[in-house]
Amino acid sequence: VGTLDGFSDATSKWFSSTFATPTAAQVDGWPAIASGAHTLIHAPTGSGKTLAAFLWAIDRLAHEPTPPERERTRVLYISPLKALAHDVERNLRGPLAGIRLAATDLGVEPPQISTGMRTGDTPQRERQAMLRHPPDILITTPESLYLMLTSRAREILAPVRWVIIDEIHSIAGTKRGSHLALSLERLAAITDVEPQRIGLSATQRPLEDIAAFLGGGIPDGDRWTPRPVTIIDAPRDKALDIEIVVPVTDMTRPELSAPPGAEADDPRRKSIWPAVYPRLLDLLNAHRSTIFFVNSRGLAERLAAELNRLAGQEVVRSHHGSVSREHRIEIEDLLKRGELRGVVATSTLELGIDMAAV
């Protein structure tokens, strides 16, 4: 199963026609996942680890008998960010459509695998529809999983066999992580069989600590037995161009860099931002697509407005938690396709999102 030997003909045909070779994360990850072991895959963004996590489960869904409708949700994907959840939902469309087409070419009944998303953005009518028609693959966040486990929605989680936790390093060791750990144990208590846990991590070490968080433990009287986790370490060297730029002569005295003739009460004498804006616009113009990260929603709005003012047209848009669901998805799609020059974002875009144009 190290390459494609363990996959069905349709899945192998689609993969071989789409990719030259499997990545290291896939070559090493598939055997562990196929064995049923809880698995932590450590690999950088863009290394194919998400497909490494999903493809085995998708292949099983595609070639097993379709269960009764109330028992269809067998794959649960948990994302720490809504934007990452939307990105994964988009990225699954290609493999699912490709495997259907490959099956048709091979004269096999094409699989009809459905996906669904449950986040804080999901309208109530969609949540109710999901209870009536559960998806095969459910994409959610830690908080939404908790809400599902405490409501009637937990009934659709009983058939879950695979749980994929993306960017697990970002929540392990945090309050959100503790909350998720409890939710995973509650999930294990209500499922028909204990789900296989698959964690994806990009940057953090020691991996043993992340693996321990992923596996959790099984109560044994007054003791606690950790679940064993297989660690797949597939790092990839990546060239980074890192530069620290100070746009003023002295950050403690921004007035020294104020333009000639600026009055004493001119705002440009009291802040470094007037010197920062032109530099950021230069960087924007020098690249196809750029993401500027800031610490607050207000700063995201102000910086986007100032860059657009300097450019004389809309060249960037702001992305943060207060932007509506529709606009966030629109911005992410435009950026992903390379049709938006830049985005000023808070942490809503910081994890694992594959923006090839950036």
Residue ranges and their predicted role:
Residues 1-13, 21, 27-28, 34-40, ...:
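Helicase motor core with emphasis on the C-terminal RecA-like subdomain
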Residues 47-48:
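ATP-binding Walker
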Residues 44:
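Walker A (P-loop) phosphate-binding loop of ABC-type ATPase nucleotide-binding domains
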